[in-house]
Structures are given as structure tokens and as C-alpha cells.
Amino acid sequence: MSDGNVAWILASTALVMLMVPGVGFFYAGMVRRKNAVNMIALSFISLIITVLLWIFYGYSVSFGNDISGIIGGLNYALLSGVKGEDLLFMMYQMMFAAVTIAILTSAIAERAKVSSFILLSALWLTFVYAPFAHWLWGGGWLAKLGALDFAGGMVVHISSGFAALAVAMTIGKRAGFEEYSIEPHSIPLTLIGAALLWFGWFGFNGGSALAANDVAINAVVVTNTSAAVAGFVWMVIGWIKGKPGSLGIVSGAIAGLAAITPAAGFVDVKGAIVIGLVAGIVCYLAMDFRIKKKIDESLDAWAIHGIGGLWGSVAVGILANPEVNGYAGLLFGNPQLLVSQLIAVASTTAYAFLVTLILAKAVDAAVGLRVSSQEEYVGLDLSQHEEVAYT
């Protein structure tokens, strides 16, 4: 690997790491002030747990010697034999895992024990994230099938989005969720988080080329395009319904970013426009569906990341342009890629939801996911951290 490529992956690693607190700020602004510290703290806890587990065995079972296409071996446990460029790749992938677990915190907003989240996140990385990473990026069965996931539409967004839905269904609604509106306490904080996420996504998608080359350039351009288109769609919807709220605009942009993630290295700008346009619509409809069904996954990891990642992963099979990276989708004469993508999407969606549901119920039965009603009333900043966000 050239010095320029090394520098780009180092920079991309730092950009992706910045997305972890970005998720924390994005979520913290949308909860009540008594839970703001907790949401940001959970993002840092996600990073800490991921770093430790990734070094001990997470990287190895994700990218180690293939075992029947299902999981990697333990040959890289404690980073044994991982040196040089492989060490850089390990660190880059570590940040992806950390961001994914941070996204999952949407499901437990304002009502979960920190200790239970630590246990659940460790189990989830082991039994959901690591298998997905191996299946698609580590030479597993979906990679052998021909499925493509450039930067994590399935590994990151489908996994975290559908897992969040399962956890939210297990932990139950927040107190007062159906009695009164629970409003964001700081939209500016959410906007800061969105800015960090959009900025970091250039390393997330651009760095996934694993080189400073034309594919990386294309990835950055289409990432920006899809985000802008989807954000514009939500802005227009806001105007149709009344006023274009800033929270809706940035939520739309994040939906566009999630949707382009699996496709960033395979589609051109025209494809990115289509992906962003559809993502803006379907993710908004998913959010509207969630509200009507009174599902308290209220920071919308499922609607934005889960549905966005699902659509983007399917779109790869339709819109992949061989001029970008050599892979052709349905519109360029290769229907087989769409078949592979549909199998991969169905498999990862079902697995993420069902396995997470089992893990969440197991943790809830063993130690309890939820804080007491009194602790929830006081707020998790005080009850879980003995701190307050504002004085």
C-alpha cells in the first residue's frame, strides 16, 4: 500500500471515529434534558466496548480464517499476527463496529440500565455484527454468493436498524409515551450531531475503497449527492405538511447517507440521485408508520438506518454501473446481482431482528434491561451517572 493510501485510510479511520460522538449528539438533542448525558455517554461506551472486544476476538471472528462461510476463526485473537497494513484495516473496521453499536442505542433511549446495555452490546457484536461482517466482507457465504455491500448497508445499517426495532419491542415504551408528546430538548445539539455524521461519512464511504483512488472519489461524491437529495425530499414534505423543520431535514439527509452506504462504490451520480430520492420517501413513510403504530423506537434507527440500508442494498442490484467499479446491476444487463442482493437483504434483515430479539429477551430475563420507574422519572443522567447536562 502506498504512503498516500495509508494516509487516506488513517484519515478515514479518524473520520469514522468522529461519527461515534456524532451519533451521541444527534440522539442527545432528541431526548429530554434529563437524559442528554446518558445518550452521549452510551456512544462513548459503545466505542470502549467495541475497542476491547475487537482486539480480543471481534476482528478475528469477523475477518479470520473462514469457517464454513459462517464465521471467522480465532487465528487473529488478541491481534496475533496482525501487522502493518492489516493493523490499519483492523482499526478502520473497529470504528465501523463502534458506530453500529452507537446507532443501536436509539432503541433504549431514556429507559435502559447502562450495565444491561454493556452486556447486550457485547453479545450483539459477537452474535450479530461479527457474523454479518464475515458474511459480506470476510469471505463468508454472502460474499461467495456475489452479494455486494460497499461500506455497510447490511453490515451496519440493516443490522443496527432492525436490531433497534427488536430491542425497542422488548424493553417497552417510555413512561408517558402514549399520554403526551415527548419533545426534543435541544435541536441545535442534534444538528451538531448531524454535521459530524455527514462529515464523518466521507471517511465511512470514501475510505471503504481502501485506497486514494477514483472509486474513493466517486464514493465521496455520490455520498454527498444522496444526502442532499434525501434531505431535500424531507424538506419538501415538511413544506407540504406545514413548515420544513430542521430536525426533519437532517433526518432526511441521514437517511440518504444510510441508503448510499452499500452503493457508494458501485453507482454513479445519477444512481445516487435515485437512491437519495427513494430513500427520502421510504424512510419518511417508515417513520410515519412507526408513529402510527405507536412503536417507541423514537430516535428512528429502524426507519432511517434499517429501511435506508435495506433500500440502498437492493438498489445496488439495480443501479450498479460497471464504469464505476466493474460491477453491473439489472439496468446494465446483470439481473443476477439483484437476485444476490435480495437474498442477502432478506437474510440479514431476518437474522438481525430475530437474533437480537432473542438476545434482548435473554438479557432482560437475566438482569433486566430497564431502569426502575423512579429512576426513569428522575432521568438517567442522575440515576445512571450522577451527573446533569445543564446547571
UniProtKB/Swiss-Prot annotation:
According to its UniProt entry, the function of this protein is described as: Involved in the uptake of ammonium/ammonia (NH(4)(+)/NH(3)). Transport is electrogenic. Transport the ammonium and methylammonium cation with high specificity.
Give the highest taxon in the source lineage.
Archaea
Residue ranges in the Extracellular topological domain are 1-7, 58-89, 138-152, 209-217, 264-268, 320-337
Query: What residues correspond to the site Twin-His motif. Important for optimum substrate conductance?
Result: H157, H305
Q: Which GO terms describe its molecular function?
A: ammonium channel activity
- Residue ranges, Cytoplasmic side: 28-38, 107-113, 171-188, 238-245, 288-300, 364-391
Gene, per the UniProt record: amt1
Please verify whether the record's keywords include Transmembrane helix.
yes
Question: Looking at the Swiss-Prot or TrEMBL record, what is one Pfam family this protein matches?
Answer: Ammonium_transp
Q: Return the Gene3D superfamilies for the record.
A: Ammonium transporter AmtB like domains
Lineage, highest ranks first: Archaea, Methanobacteriati, Methanobacteriota, Archaeoglobi, Archaeoglobales
State how it assembles: Homotrimer.
Membrane-traversing stretches: 8-27, 39-57, 90-106, 114-137, 153-170, 189-208, 218-237, 246-263, 269-287, 301-319, 338-363
Family from the record: Belongs to the ammonia transporter channel (TC 1.A.11.2) family.
* Keywords noted in UniProt: Ammonia transport, Cell membrane, Membrane, Transmembrane, Transmembrane helix, Transport
Q: Give the organism, scientific name.
A: Archaeoglobus fulgidus (strain ATCC 49558 / DSM 4304 / JCM 9628 / NBRC 100126 / VC-16)
Question: Which positions make up the signal peptide?
Answer: none
Q: Which InterPro entries match?
A: Ammonium/urea_transptr, Ammonium_transpt, NH4_transpt_AmtB-like_dom
Where in or outside the cell? Answer: Cell membrane
What is the protein name given in its UniProt record? Ammonium transporter Amt1
